[in-house]
Amino acid sequence: MKVAVGVHIIADLYGVDARLISSSEAISPIMENAIQEGHLTKISSEYYQFRPMGASGIALLAESHLSFHTWPEYGLVTLDIYTCGDRSNADRAFDYIIKVLKPTSVDYRKMERGSQIKEDVRITDPQMML
Amino acid sequence: MKVAVGVHIIADLYGVDARLISSSEAISPIMENAIQEGHLTKISSEYYQFRPMGASGIALLAESHLSFHTWPEYGLVTLDIYTCGDRSNADRAFDYIIKVLKPTSVDYRKMERGSQIKEDVRITDPQMML
């Protein structure tokens, strides 16, 4: 049986109000709230402020990761939400971000990650690998 | 004129020797070296060890990000290298990782991010956005 390990939403958001995405202070609550809305488990998160404007944020999750990179000069956010486990979690986090940022258009793709894995190749004895 | 802000390599690596990817100690030098090989600028990196095995690593780069998630029980690494600037940097980092991990097969995609941006929509006065 084939199994995929996770689902990855890859979205470029256009026409976002630059004031919402110019600073790390602006994007950090959006990202942190998206993690909560998605019922995701944060291991750590890191934000960075570019000069004169623009920000990046990346969160390491127990379920994989979530990242934000912003170009306020273009009204652009490039967003990745990659989660394992309950597939609706990524959707919930994504829907929250769209609700807050209100892009005028979105280039959206959703990918299966690890989709060539077959359950029967699973190595069941972890000691084999140490 | 249309411009893309970056290039994103999305790759699932299969058939990787589980010993190379079972621990955060094993993957961290690979990731850090890939950043150097790609001439990328690290802002921060974070690693996490799953029990009984498997690891995640994520690096925030001035050029965007690089992430690793491993499932040694499947011989699987899901890898993302997303960079702005010189497009050959992502390729160099990717080539290094492939050379070290020697997967038996790779599901590889390369995407333009922010590809709907038009240069003429650029807002040139940053004060407009503050």
Swiss-Prot record, chains A, B:
GO terms for molecular function: adenosylmethionine decarboxylase activity. Is synthesized initially as an inactive proenzyme. Formation of the active enzyme involves a self-maturation process in which the active site pyruvoyl group is generated from an internal serine residue via an autocatalytic post-translational modification. Two non-identical subunits are generated from the proenzyme in this reaction, and the pyruvate is formed at the N-terminus of the alpha chain, which is derived from the carboxyl end of the proenzyme. The lineage of its organism: Archaea, Methanobacteriati, Thermoplasmatota, Thermoplasmata, Thermoplasmatales. Binds 1 pyruvoyl group covalently per subunit. Belongs to the prokaryotic AdoMetDC family. Type 1 subfamily. The gene is speH. This is S-adenosylmethionine decarboxylase proenzyme. It comes from the Archaea. The record marks E63, S64 as: Cleavage (non-hydrolytic). GO terms for cellular component: cytosol. It catalyses: S-adenosyl-L-methionine + H(+) = S-adenosyl 3-(methylsulfanyl)propylamine + CO2. Catalyzes the decarboxylation of S-adenosylmethionine to S-adenosylmethioninamine (dcAdoMet), the propylamine donor required for the synthesis of the polyamines spermine and spermidine from the diamine putrescine. It is an enzyme of class 4 (lyase). The keyword Lyase applies. Its EC number is 4.1.1.50. Its cofactor is pyruvate. The modification Pyruvic acid (Ser) is found at S64. PANTHER family: S-ADENOSYLMETHIONINE DECARBOXYLASE PROENZYME. Heterotetramer of two alpha and two beta chains arranged as a dimer of alpha/beta heterodimers. Keywords: Autocatalytic cleavage, Decarboxylase, Lyase, Polyamine biosynthesis, Pyruvate, S-adenosyl-L-methionine, Schiff base, Spermidine biosynthesis, Zymogen. The active site is at S64, H69, C84. One of its GO terms (biological process) is spermidine biosynthetic process. Pathway: Amine and polyamine biosynthesis; S-adenosylmethioninamine biosynthesis; S-adenosylmethioninamine from S-adenosyl-L-methionine: step 1/1.
